[in-house]
């Protein structure tokens, strides 16, 4: 039986607020983000075709300017180990030694990857992780609840996870998701 009251819960589990950003959101007013009190930003670094997100440079620079701790994510379209290694190398190249306070998140949600099976996804994720950590960056896996429960194998659950849990009720905010590290 859980006997936590609200105050105990808040004391035990620190709430942090963050956003994930890509070119889909357009040009962000980072001063407003900082004034709103965001604790972190996770920026998309590359998009389909291994092309650098057109707003990555600006977003990274503005996060540093406003002291917003930063991480990056790579939505993977890879279907082979060679492809995911290429994606990882592109991430490292695009980062070019930049400092990150949060991990490089491998975004595993591409529906075509499901057909590869859990074991192949496991091998691909570890191939990506080796390149990222060899470059000195922290690594984690981003996915939605469905992928975490039904696609990700237990071998990968040793890594940090950022799990998207999209809000069911519209509170007037758009493109809002709650991420938790498991």
Per-segment meaning from a language model:
Residues 28-37, 55-68, 91-100, 175-177:
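Acidic (Asp/Glu)-rich catalytic clusters
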Residues 17-21, 41-43, 70-74, 104-106, ...:
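Hydrophobic faces of well-ordered beta-strands that scaffold small-molecule active sites
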Residues 19, 33, 63, 106, ...:
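Conserved, mostly hydrophobic/aromatic
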């Amino acid at each position: 039986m859980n006997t936590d009251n609200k105050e105990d819960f808040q004391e035990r589990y620190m709430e942090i607020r963050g956003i994930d950003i890509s070119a889909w959101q357009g040009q962000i007013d980072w001063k407003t983000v900082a004034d709103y009190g965001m604790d972190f930003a996770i920026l998309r670094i590359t998009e389909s075709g291994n092309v650098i997100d057109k707003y990555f440079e600006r977003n990274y620079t503005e996060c540093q300017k406003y002291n917003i701790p930063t991480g990056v994510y790579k939505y993977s379209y890879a279907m082979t180990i060679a492809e995911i290694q290429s994606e990882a190398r592109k991430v490292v190249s695009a980062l070019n030694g930049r400092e990150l306070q949060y991990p490089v998140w491998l975004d595993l949600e591409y529906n075509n990857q499901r057909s590869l099976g859990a074991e192949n996804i496991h091998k691909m994720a570890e191939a990506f992780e080796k390149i990222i950590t060899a470059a000195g960056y922290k690594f984690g896996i981003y996915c939605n609840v469905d992928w975490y429960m039904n696609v990700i194998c237990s071998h990968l659950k040793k890594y940090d996870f950022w799990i998207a849990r999209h809000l069911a009720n519209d509170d007037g905010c758009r493109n809002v998701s709650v991420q938790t590290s498991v």
